[in-house]
């Protein structure tokens, strides 16, 4: 049996905190103003109509309606459409 730990074991033993990133409200889901739609690092998704962007690139709803994912000029965008129009 080893009587010393070894060099690597004393250097390990730490982990980063979970970031909880990703899409929080999917296409077709109805949201109210202020709800977070996507948590991201960088602009993987860009804000469209009725969507704002926070300082950490989080996308959130500026108005109530249904979430709609699409593309514009080759970029993925998130829009909010009127809930009645989405049904």
Curated annotation (Swiss-Prot):
One of its GO terms (cellular component) is cytosolic large ribosomal subunit. The keyword Hydrolase does not apply. One of its GO terms (molecular function) is structural constituent of ribosome. Pfam families: Ribosomal_L27 (PF01016). Keywords: Ribonucleoprotein, Ribosomal protein. One of its GO terms (biological process) is translation. PANTHER family: LARGE RIBOSOMAL SUBUNIT PROTEIN BL27M, RIBOSOMAL PROTEIN L27. Belongs to the bacterial ribosomal protein bL27 family. This is Large ribosomal subunit protein bL27. It comes from Paenarthrobacter aurescens (strain TC1). The lineage of its organism: Bacteria, Bacillati, Actinomycetota, Actinomycetes, Micrococcales.
């Amino acid at each position: 049996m080893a009587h010393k730990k070894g060099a690597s074991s004393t250097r390990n033993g730490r982990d980063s905190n979970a970031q909880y990133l990703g899409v929080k409200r999917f296409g077709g889901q109805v949201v109210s103003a202020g709800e977070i739609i996507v948590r991201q690092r960088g602009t993987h998704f860009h804000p469209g109509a009725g969507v704002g962007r926070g300082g950490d690139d989080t996308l959130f709803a500026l108005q109530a309606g249904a979430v709609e994912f699409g593309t514009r000029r080759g970029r993925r965008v998130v829009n909010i459409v009127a809930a009645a129009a989405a049904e």
